[in-house]
Every structure is written in structure tokens, then in C-alpha cells.
Regions:
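Signature for HUH/AEP ssDNA processing cores
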Residues: 1-80, 87-100, 157-161
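DNA replication initiation modules
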Residues: 28-52, 88-165
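Short Gly/Ser/Thr- and Asp/Glu-enriched loop/turn motifs at secondary-structure junctions
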Residues: 75-82, 117-121
Length: 166
């Protein structure tokens, strides 16, 4: 039903009624300081509305699956975006991994949702008939203290490969 409606209020309601998890760990409360057991996974969202030049999410998912550190890639609950689950090795550096991923994806001209920097971010269940799963994905090791992607020179961004955009 969520993927069938264009009514934004109805979409929000339907999405909020879906089962959900916190990908990055088990929490006693949904607060960063309430982490009980980390999973050493980060989930990033790539929304279609933020990336209008991506016209085919299925083809785009296949491109994301080529990244050696992507463990899982699937369609978002709306079907208009994608998400990736990526392993890392130090939960204390969650935001630093996110910053590096945000920069790396920006260089590929892909905007990832900045709210994914939150270690207790909720991930709503979504169905994907053709998810990508790689149990042998590489552990992501890059970190970055701060991300200042808004100030990247356009030459830096647009000199990167445009073949990511489908």
C-alpha cells in the first residue's frame, strides 16, 4: 500500500506502522547513550528525491552492489530509494565512518541522507524482490573527522564518473 499511494500524509502513516530495527545495534532506548550491543553495521539511505538523476533504482542497486564494502542493498519502503548496510570495525567511530561514506558518495554524485549519521537511526522494514547480499563484504575502514561536502568545488565533484547515475 505504501508504494501505491502518492498522498504524503498517508505514506508517512503507513511507513510509521511498519516494523523497524536499529541496524547499528541493540538499544535500551532509542538514544545513542543507550547502546547495549553494537552490530558494527551502518545503514545509509539514498532517497530518489535527493538524487533525481537516478531513474532506475534496480540498475542503481546493481551499481551499489559493485562496491566491495556493501553487505546488503535493497529498495526503501517507498520503493523510490535504496539503502545499503555496510560493516565497520569500531562502533565508537560511527559518525566518522558516516562522514567518510558521505564524502565518497558525494564524489560519485550521490547524496546520502545525513540523518544516517545517527547510530540509533530507525530502519523501517521494506520488501525487495531482488536484494543484494554479500556476507563476505569488506569492512569499511575510512573515517573522516568532519564532512564539509557543501563546500566541495564543483570541479572536484563533477570530474568524477557520471556513469553511476542511471
Amino acid at each position: 500500500k505504501l508504494r501505491e499511494t502518492d498522498d504524503e500524509e498517508k505514506r508517512k502513516y503507513l511507513k510509521s506502522s511498519l516494523p523497524a530495527i536499529t541496524v547499528s545495534g541493540v538499544f535500551s532506548k532509542r538514544r545513542a547513550d543507550s547502546l547495549i550491543r553494537p552490530s558494527n553495521l551502518i545503514c545509509i539511505d539514498i532517497d530518489g528525491k535527493d538524487n533525481p538523476s537516478i531513474s532506475d533504482m534496480e540498475k542503481f542497486k546493481k551499481r551499489l552492489a559493485e562496491l566491495p564494502y556493501v553487505m546488503y542493498c535493497g529498495l526503501s519502503a517507498s520503493g523510490k530509494g535504496a539503502f545499503c548496510i555496510i560493516p565497520y570495525d569500531d562502533f565508537g567511530k560511527h559518525k566518522l565512518y558516516f562522514n567518510a561514506l558521505q564524502r565518497e558518495f558525494k564524489e560519485m554524485e550521490i547524496i546520502i541522507d545525513s540523518s544516517c549519521s545517527d547510530i540509533c537511526r530507525l530502519r523501517f522494514y521494506s520488501y525487495d524482490e531482488h536484494p543484494y547480499v554479500n556476507w563476505d563484504a569488506e569492512v569499511y575502514t575510512h573515517t573522516m573527522e568532519k564532512t564539509n561536502i557543501a563546500h566541495l568545488k564543483s570541479k572536484e565533484v563533477f570530474s568524477k564518473r557520471r556513469d553511476w547515475l542511471i
